[in-house]
């Protein structure tokens, strides 16, 4: 497995920052790939749990082979927000939470594996 020398962070691509459209995310992906930056860093909670889906929707419309890019994701923080039933911010590293987070990331990123 080879990652690009610089990893592109997506934390502020969604509602926590620029609130990019699908088209803008596609431009960011294209620009990254033009510079040979092929590794994209995600976390389940980015954008109140919406940024991975935004990225997945954008990427799935592009004609880029999945094996030509790397997707990294993280989990463990339960953040209160509209689309989650967490009452307080907390950390959860249980096997159940990790497996659930990974499954959600796979679905949102529209991929069958994480790198």
Regions found by a protein language model. Give the residues of each.
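N-terminal binding-site loop/beta-alpha segment at the start of enzyme catalytic domains
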Residues: 1-70
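Short glycine-enriched loops at secondary-structure junctions
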Residues: 13, 75-77, 104
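Structural motif corresponding to the early beta-alpha repeats
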Residues: 62-95
């Amino acid at each position: 497995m080879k990652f690009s020398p610089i990893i592109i962070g997506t934390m502020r691509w969604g509602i926590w920052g620029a609130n990019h459209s699908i088209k803008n995310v596609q431009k960011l992906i294209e620009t990254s790939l033009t510079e040979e930056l092929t590794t994209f860093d995600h976390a389940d909670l980015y954008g109140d749990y919406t940024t991975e889906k935004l990225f997945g929707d954008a990427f799935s419309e592009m004609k880029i082979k999945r094996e030509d890019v790397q997707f990294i994701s993280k989990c463990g923080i339960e953040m209160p927000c509209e689309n989650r039933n967490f009452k307080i911010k907390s950390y959860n590293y249980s096997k159940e939470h990790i497996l659930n987070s990974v499954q959600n990331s796979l679905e949102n990123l529209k991929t069958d594996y994480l790198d």
